[in-house]
């Protein structure tokens, strides 16, 4: 059983989500407004479902605000299907998105897939790779004692490439590792994530991710 928070201004949607996920034995808390809520209301959950179009705050902006406080998967609920909007949401720290209207089986499958992946990632260890210190338990990366301020998906990309140092992966392979076979994001999101990772690494005079033209990316 997982503890899940669903945030949406439409109460009918919240009740539907609650009923669907309770069938999977999950505890589901609901929130139909965000304004005036203390930051800790978003903490302590295994997964958060976050509507994009809310009257008091844009869901992307809310994700950006709470991401430093929570380490669980954040899935957007959205009617937006434009590439720019999707990429924006994932770059702010979201892990995936579910398009409205959604089916009962789709919501259940996506939520449970992310929960399974999250449980697999909860292992206790650390490792130095190419001068970068990876803390796999806390999902943090350090270089020269400086912490890289990575989003959750940026960290996943770094860990995946670093643990397979020297091996080249296509954008599609990286996408599958981050989002799984049932991912609903866009391949161009991976390109944007890597661009941002490189920028953050270069602030510390490091450039571990190399482009293999026509093939993909590798960690050196």
From Swiss-Prot:
A single Gene Ontology CC term: protein-DNA complex
GO MF annotation terms: phosphorelay response regulator activity; transcription cis-regulatory region binding
DNA-binding region per UniProt: 124-220
UniProt xrefs under SMART domains: REC, Trans_reg_C
Location of 4-aspartylphosphate modifications: 51
One biological process term in Gene Ontology: regulation of DNA-templated transcription
Keywords attached to this entry: Activator, Cytoplasm, DNA-binding, Phosphoprotein, Transcription, Transcription regulation, Two-component regulatory system
Classification via InterPro entries: CheY-like_superfamily, OmpR/PhoB-type_DNA-bd, Sig_transdc_resp-reg_C-effctor, Sig_transdc_resp-reg_receiver, WalR-like, WH-like_DNA-bd_sf
Keyword presence, DNA-binding: yes
Compartments in which it is found: Cytoplasm
Main location: cytoplasm
PTM comment text: Phosphorylated by SpaK.
Top-level taxonomic group: Bacteria
Domain Response regulatory: 3-115
Task performed by this protein: Member of the two-component regulatory system SpaK/SpaR involved in the regulation of the biosynthesis of lantibiotic subtilin. SpaR may function as a regulatory protein.
Name the record gives this protein: Transcriptional regulatory protein SpaR
């Amino acid at each position: 059983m997982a503890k899940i928070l669903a945030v949406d201004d439409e109460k009918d949607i919240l009740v539907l989500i609650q009923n669907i996920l309770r069938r999977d034995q999950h505890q589901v808390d609901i929130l139909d407004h965000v304004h005036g809520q203390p930051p800790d209301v978003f903490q302590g959950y295994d997964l958060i479902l976050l509507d994009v179009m809310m009257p008091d705050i844009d869901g992307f902006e809310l994700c950006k605000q709470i991401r430093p406080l929570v380490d669980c998967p954040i899935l957007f609920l959205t009617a937006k299907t434009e590439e720019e909007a999707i990429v924006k949401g994932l770059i702010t720290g979201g892990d995936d998105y579910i398009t409205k209207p959604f089916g009962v089986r789709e919501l259940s499958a996506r939520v449970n897939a992310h929960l399974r992946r999250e449980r697999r990632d909860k292992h206790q260890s650390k490792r130095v790779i190419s001068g970068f210190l990876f803390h796999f338990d806390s999902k943090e990366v350090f270089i020269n004692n400086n912490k890289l301020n990575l989003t959750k998906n940026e960290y996943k990309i770094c860990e995946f490439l670093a643990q397979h140092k020297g091996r080249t992966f296509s954008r599609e392979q990286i996408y599958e590792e981050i989002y799984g076979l049932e991912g609903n994001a866009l391949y161009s999101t991976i390109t944007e994530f890597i661009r941002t990772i490189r920028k953050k690494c270069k602030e510390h005079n490091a450039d571990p991710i190399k482009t293999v033209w026509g093939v993909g990316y590798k960690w050196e």
